[in-house]
């Protein structure tokens, strides 16, 4: 129930943990740093998987699966890559009661094991492009964990593509980060900023990394997806060459891209409230709950409740009845608000007599009456669409309110405690590092979307807020998860 949840204003971090556990989304396990994703949480992941998988396949990608274990020699082939991941790796040293001749790394990401296969599969330009996605689990030995947001083991998808030219790889990188943006905004109702990472923040082993960044209700940023241009780095590490259409040998160009179950954490922190989970209808496996108010003629009310569910299902709206008598209607109202069911329908004897019902929205908690006539399903569908749009609009308005532009470092230090900060940066790793050390804020993204560039005149030259040196453009700073 909602009374188990600490309020956001009292302790935002505890609110998040309380909500995840009370809404039965996930729980701690007996394995340090690992979580149990409960059915309510996994249902959200399944909806995410289905939407993303369809988007991937629409753009020509196919699914495959590669081994969980990666030989140490493979990991060592790409020096920058292993340097970035070594501290987080879990390593298998024994198997079958014996010490292994070569250590096996439990995958932190799959570039190396996949490129070992690509080397065997690619000989000619006719073998390209390869557009493969993998749904899998990965392990990164995290020291400070938080349910969904940062765990030792998590679920994700990782795309790995191979191309004949740098330009084709660049197109793929932008195509996939655009798909992630579309998914975040259209399904998660989550406005995101799309752009490039700085050199120090890019993926280990990549030439460049593109990302989408979202704002949570505490003003912090959350990286919601990344797409990496790997250049020819992994192809060279695995000697993966192909014969071009001109008959020459060249190394293959590569990309990788991924999102994970941390998107569920983003969903929770972007939309939910002190009563519990708030879900966009497109990611709710159960969009409507019908709660009969059983007084007087119970049979007629139950029959009408079942009829409502049947009608809604025929129109593609996932609905169910809770007719159990163990708990009161009031208890059920609170419980389904906690679980984030987007729409509640209340039906009692008086409603039945008036050929109507009461509907309650989870996003605004507003109640209205709907006639039980031929327009009923259409009106429910319209309300669900309205909830989806309202959640996006509300999150966008919040982000805009919590985004400020500053001209001095003193202004910056105050502003970055509350949200996103737009400021000039001189482009040096030194300045970026010192700002992070002093404020714990990082450069989240160098925006590339025209709308965002125009809104904040991002490409306007100026003076770096920290060093006072000339700055070619503005960037987005924030504290982050």
UniProtKB/Swiss-Prot annotation:
SUPFAM superfamilies: C-terminal domain of ProRS, Class II aaRS ABD-related, Class II aaRS and biotin synthetases. It catalyses: tRNA(Pro) + L-proline + ATP = L-prolyl-tRNA(Pro) + AMP + diphosphate. SMART domains: ProRS-C_1. PROSITE patterns: AA_TRNA_LIGASE_II. It is an enzyme of class 6 (ligase). GO terms for cellular component: aminoacyl-tRNA synthetase multienzyme complex; cytoplasm. Belongs to the class-II aminoacyl-tRNA synthetase family. ProS type 3 subfamily. This is Proline--tRNA ligase. The gene is proS.
């Amino acid at each position: 129930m909602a009374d188990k949840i600490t309020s956001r204003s009292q302790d935002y971090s505890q609110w998040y943990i309380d909500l995840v556990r009370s809404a039965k989304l996930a729980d701690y396990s007996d394995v340090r740093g690992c979580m149990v994703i409960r059915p309510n949480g996994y249902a959200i992941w399944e909806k995410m998987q289905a939407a993303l998988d369809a988007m991937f396949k629409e753009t020509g990608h196919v699914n495959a699966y590669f081994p969980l274990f990666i030989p140490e020699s493979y990991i060592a082939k790409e020096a920058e890559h292993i340097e970035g991941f070594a501290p987080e790796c879990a390593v298998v040293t024994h198997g079958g009661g014996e010490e292994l001749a070569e250590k096996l790394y439990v995958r932190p990401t799959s570039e190396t094991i996949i490129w070992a296969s690509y080397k065997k599969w690619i000989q000619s330009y006719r073998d390209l492009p390869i557009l493969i996605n993998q749904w899998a689990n990965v392990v990164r030995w995290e020291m400070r964990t938080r349910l969904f947001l940062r765990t030792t083991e998590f679920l994700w998808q990782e795309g790995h593509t191979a191309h004949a030219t740098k330009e084709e790889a660049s197109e793929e990188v932008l195509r996939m980060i655009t798909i992630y943006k579309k998914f975040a905004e259209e399904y998660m109702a989550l406005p995101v900023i799309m752009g490039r990472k700085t050199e120090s923040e890019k993926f280990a082993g990549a030439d460049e990394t593109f990302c989408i960044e979202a704002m949570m209700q505490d003003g912090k940023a959350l990286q919601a997806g990344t797409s990496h241009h790997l250049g020819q780095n992994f192809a060279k590490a695995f000697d993966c060459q192909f014969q071009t259409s001109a008959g020459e040998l060249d190394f293959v160009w590569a990309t990788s891209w991924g999102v994970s179950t941390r998107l569920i954490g983003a969903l929770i922190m972007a939309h939910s409230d002190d009563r519990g989970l708030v879900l966009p209808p497109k990611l709710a496996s159960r969009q409507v709950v019908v709660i009969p108010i059983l007084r007087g003629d119970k049979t007629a009310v139950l029959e009408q409740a079942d009829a409502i569910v049947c009608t809604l299902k025929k129109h593609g709206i996932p609905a169910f009845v809770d007719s159990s008598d163990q708990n009161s209607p009031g208890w059920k109202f609170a419980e389904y608000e906690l679980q984030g069911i987007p729409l509640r329908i209340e039906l009692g004897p008086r409603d039945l007599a008036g050929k109507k019902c009461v509907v309650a929205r989870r996003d605004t908690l507003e109640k209205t009456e709907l006639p039980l006539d031929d327009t009923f399903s259409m009106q429910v569908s319209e309300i669900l669409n309205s909830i989806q749009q309202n959640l996006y609009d509300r999150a966008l308005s919040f982000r805009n309110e919590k985004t400020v532009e500053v001209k001095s470092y003193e202004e910056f230090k105050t502003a970055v405690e509350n949200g996103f900060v737009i400021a000039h940066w001189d482009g040096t790793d030194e300045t970026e590092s010192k700002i992070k050390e002093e404020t714990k804020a990082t450069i989240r993204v160098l925006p590339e979307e025209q709308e965002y560039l125009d809104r904040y005149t991002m490409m306007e030259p100026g003076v770096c807020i920290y060093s006072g040196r000339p700055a070619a453009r503005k960037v987005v700073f924030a504290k982050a998860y």
